[in-house]
Design a protein with these regions (language model features):
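Generic alpha-helical structural element
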Residues: 9-16, 35-38, 98, 102
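A mid-sequence, solvent-exposed acidic-amphipathic segment
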Residues: 21-45, 50-55
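A generic structural signal for ordered alpha-helices
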Residues: 5, 20, 27-28, 91
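Alpha-helical oligomerization segments
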Residues: 44, 55-139
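Helix-loop junctions and short alpha-helical segments
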Residues: 1-21
Length: 139
């Protein structure tokens, strides 16, 4: 099981349903190496969760939000980007990408998902901090 503090923090947060928590923690386990389908499935579940928070994430960092959703939509995660018969979705570079390189980009996308959830959590924390600061400064 992965020992990434970020993965554990996000997996244990209220933002993540229990059925997805274990998948997040085990994502970087050695047994997952080369398992593109399982990695894709985990990222897809995270993408679904982030879709519901997309507006909020865009307020935190619109460029980051744009980048992560670009990866979801163009790396054969949410859409079939490798079948040339699917007009408008096919991406030659993705279709030609060696599995090792695609796995690298899946791993980067996973890391960006962790960061997205942490940034959303920090946005909530910042609101609470601002309230505390206001109380402290008003005395």
């Amino acid at each position: 099981v992965e020992k990434s503090p970020a993965a554990i923090s996000v997996a244990e947060s209220e933002q993540i349903p229990k059925e997805i928590s274990y998948k997040m923690i085990s994502y970087n386990h050695h047994s997952m190496r080369g398992n593109l389908q399982e990695k894709k499935n985990t990222i897809l579940k995270l993408a679904e969760l982030l879709e519901a928070k997309r507006t909020e994430l865009a307020k935190v960092d619109s460029k980051f939000c744009s980048d992560i959703f670009y990866l979801f939509n163009n790396l054969n995660i949410r859409h079939n980007n490798v079948d040339p018969s699917i007009s408008g979705k096919f991406k030659q570079a993705v279709a030609d990408m060696p599995p090792e390189k695609l796995e690298h980009w899946y791993d980067e996308t996973y890391q960006m998902c962790l960061l997205a959830f942490l940034r959303l959590e920090q946005a909530d924390r910042k609101m609470e901090f601002d309230k505390l600061k206001s109380v402290i400064e008003s005395n």
